[in-house]
């Protein structure tokens, strides 16, 4: 669970900014979206391989350019 404490002389805006940063770094929203529906392990593996392949192609294109 992500939480923040209000520090001395801290505005609500700064508190919310710190909370948002911690929330994003913790990956809460990403995990929530991932668990919103079930995907079979075989589908997960296929998507993971496709992402890896695209990443490798981009890296190869950048190194050749």
From Swiss-Prot:
Biological process annotations from GO: translation
GO CC terms in record: ribonucleoprotein complex; ribosome
Keywords for the protein's UniProt record, in alphabetical order: Ribonucleoprotein, Ribosomal protein
Regions of compositional bias (Basic residues) in chain numbering: 48-57
Disulfide cross-links: none
GO molecular function, one term: structural constituent of ribosome
Ranges for region Disordered: 43-65
InterPro entries in UniProt: Ribosomal_bS21, Ribosomal_bS21_sf
Similarity field: Belongs to the bacterial ribosomal protein bS21 family.
Identification of the protein by name: Small ribosomal subunit protein bS21
């Amino acid at each position: 669970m992500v939480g923040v404490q209000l520090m001395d002389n801290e505005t609500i805006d700064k508190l919310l900014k710190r909370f948002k940063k911690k929330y994003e770094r913790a990956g809460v929203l990403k995990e929530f979206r991932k668990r919103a529906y079930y995907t079979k392990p075989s589908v997960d593996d296929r998507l993971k391989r496709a992402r890896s392949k695209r990443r490798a192609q981009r890296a190869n294109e950048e190194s050749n350019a």
